[in-house]
Amino acid sequence: MQGAVYTPEMPPRLLTTAVLVFLCASSPSFAQSTANPGPPTVADAQAFIDRANADLLELSTAASHAEWVAETDITDDTEATTAVLNEQATSRTLALTAESHRFDNLAMPADLKRQIMLLQVTAPAAPKDPKLLAEQSELAAQLTGMYGKGKFCPGTPSGQDPAPGADCLGIDAISTIMSRSRDPEELTRLWVGWHSIGAPMREKYARFIELQNIGARELGYHDTGELWRAGYDMTPAQFSAEMEHAWQQLEPLYRELHTYVRARLIAKYGKAADRPDGMIPAQLLGNMWAQEWGNIYDIVAPTDPQLSQFKPLDLEAALKHQIAEKDPAAAPAFTPGTDLTSDKGHAASLAAGRAMVHYGENFFKSLGFAPLPATFWQRSQFVHPRDREVVCHASAWDVDSVEDLRVKMCIEVNADYFTTVHHELGHDFYFRAYDNKPFLFRNGANDGFHEAIGDSIALSITPAYLNTLGLADSEPPAAADVPLQLRTALDKVAFLPFALALDKWRWQVFSGEIKPADYNKAWWQLREKYQGVAPPVDRTEADFDPGAKNHVPTNVPYARYFLARLYQFQFYKAMCDASGYKGPLNRCSFYNSKAAGEKLNQMLQAGQSQPWQQTLKQMTGTDHLDAQPMLDYFAPLYAWLKQQNAAAAQQ
């Protein structure tokens, strides 16, 4: 649907509660009851849905504008405004959902029935009581703001406000340092410093969960987790089982990767990495949440001379060189010592950010998609503004369901953002493909689809593709596949257990299986069980480490990212097949294939108008989540990891 969609490591929302629902806050037609004393008819149901779609579309535009302002100018005032709008919006959506149940037992065309069902399962988990609803809306705004304004001030004692002018670091700056530092003590300080932002959220979050569950029960669900899992054209229990089955398929590959990486970290750091319980210290993996490990490739790269001769392309250097060469105005952004807050420095950063986005747009254009509208370039946020606080987590926006597509990012020129740009544009091209559908069908087939589109494109960022762009001098031989695959797996495979653990923790919090008194203990039990990672220092219930991950305080479901990591390989294989590619899956790029683009566009245009199983089958030939394409992709690496680990075990 309309609104914002966020990327994994910088986050999500397919139509958040705030956006879905401000929708109805002041709609004239919804202000009037459609109650009818007689039995409902199909004509009544159609009239209801027609009104709902029209009003939701009109009001969604206003909501999207409000949400955009709140996230691109974080102040107490924008927080307060968002809280009020959320409260009004949620109240009206709950009323609309309640009205829709009038048609529950009515026989009607499948298309109409599906729209009513989607309205019901996307209802926000919010209490009907106005006072409780107001409290929930205020808490939601506070938690989002606490994360968005989070800082680590190295010279400030824990629990104290920083002095004026103190040198404080936001999550982007911290993440950059963590990606590059190889000092275990520095990494521990940064990890502990950022995770300290969670503790003040703890009580607010516990109350927020209580209020959400009240709303979920009023909608007929046991808890909010069950409500979240109900939106997948299967029962909540079936959805949980589908995810668990996929993890069981993938776990052997992950365990081999974990074993290999742990051994290399011990070789690098010694006792700092060698825990007797076999866990990897989370701060050593190059990412604040240990969710993606690609930043430590230099530590774990193959040492076999036959493989070590193949060095991963320094894409960051290649991008900076090419961008500066094509647009000299961007060059100062890459010059050491440039003040990026100056007019010249900021203009250079903006030019570099726009150039990064053009790479992604050009890939979609090569598949036959139309260029992005002029307003996209005028209204998007590509870099961090100089004059205000913003939420830097990358997100894609469909503000008016016509042509007002945007992204909100704080782009840096590096390999990670190169991939993130492709990911976010996948959302925007998806938005545009289904914008001719009724409002309630304007969504991905499920939320995992939305996250997977751009990433399936990014899998085509192969050495051959980079060579085509002039970012690589030549295409490496097949012997180079293992190093390249290892670099990819450090992100894509390592991410899966983190995504699973995060939402399993949250589902158990919603269900009451995890009590507030055990929030942090349970968090680390799940992280250890699925990821095999542990915190760098002892943690207690005075801490709230889940709050240091954006998706928890902003209440964004995370299962979509687990799904997306698998769907992207299913989509990728389907488009490779459509392009006529023959050869190892991991070496395919369907850049410039109009046949692949047509297959992709057909899937995007369906939106949520049919069960995702049907859309998936039309795209891939199978109607279920399938890890096999991912396993096929990483087959060379899996064989090599098993060989390496077996040899190490014999030493």
Question: Language-model segments: which ranges?
Answer:
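N-terminal helix-rich structural modules
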Residues: 32-207, 225, 549, 553-559, ...
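Bacterial N-terminal signal peptides that target proteins for export
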Residues: 4-16
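Bacterial N-terminal signal peptides
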Residues: 16-27
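Charge-rich, acidic-biased intrinsically disordered regions
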Residues: 70-88, 104-125, 155-182, 217-238, ...
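Short pre-active-site segment immediately N-terminal to the catalytic Zn-binding motif
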Residues: 405-421
